[in-house]
Amino acid sequence: MDARQFHEEAALFVDALCELKALGPLRVLLPHWPMSMGLTDEWVELARALKTVRVQHAGQIPEELMDRLASLQHAAESAVNGQ
């Protein structure tokens, strides 16, 4: 997933969380999304936030969004690792 695809998918994911009124996951993600400059430290924080949402708030997110969340987390971690 390239950066453009990542940003499109992340925007759709955040929009879906807003529609669900999933305040817990939004509280974790919104301080890190959208990124201001896309620097490595921002990618690290976003990857960490995505992981936190996946682990701590899974019960508030439907299965199809969990798949998107896992994909976003993997892509953010890959961006940090330069893959």
What is each of the regions a protein language model found here?
Residues 1-83:
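C-terminal-biased regions
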